[in-house]
């Protein structure tokens, strides 16, 4: 199964990377490594996660982030990577744009 990270999700990753890098030098890189590892696991586990707001939601193991994706034919499309600490109405609004 192929994984495709859409530009909206890439933007989410960049924003979170910048935030964590300002917290501690190297933490942003650790964040990216962790999230990419979580996303890579979708090759084996895509479609097994709960559906939330029309997307499957993978919760990151080390950071309070969720990966929102859909399985389309033989591909996993990652639409958003969002901080779970955000206001739920903000998350709904963000996902409704996809």
Feature-to-residue mapping (PLM):
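Residue-level recognition of specific faces of alpha-helices
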Residues: 12, 16, 38-41, 57, ...
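Short, hydrophobic secondary-structure boundary micro-motifs
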Residues: 29, 50-52, 90
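Amphipathic alpha-helical recognition patches that constitute DNA-binding helices
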Residues: 4, 26, 30, 57, ...
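Basic/aromatic recognition patch in beta-strand/loop cores that engages polyanionic ligands
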Residues: 37, 44-76
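Arg/Lys-rich, positively charged N-terminal/basic patches that mediate binding to nucleic acids
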Residues: 1-32
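Enriched for short, Lys/Arg-rich terminal
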Residues: 70-98
């Amino acid at each position: 199964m192929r994984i495709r990270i859409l530009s909206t999700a890439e933007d989410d990753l960049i924003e979170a990377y910048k935030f964590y890098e300002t917290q501690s030098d190297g933490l942003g890189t650790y964040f990216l490594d962790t999230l990419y590892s979580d996303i890579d696991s979708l090759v084996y586990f895509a479609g097994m996660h709960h559906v939330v707001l029309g997307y499957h939601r993978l919760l990151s193991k080390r950071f309070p982030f969720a990966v929102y994706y859909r399985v389309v034919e033989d591909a996993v499309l990652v639409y958003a990577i969002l901080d779970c600490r955000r206001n739920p109405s903000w998350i709904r609004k963000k996902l409704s744009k996809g």
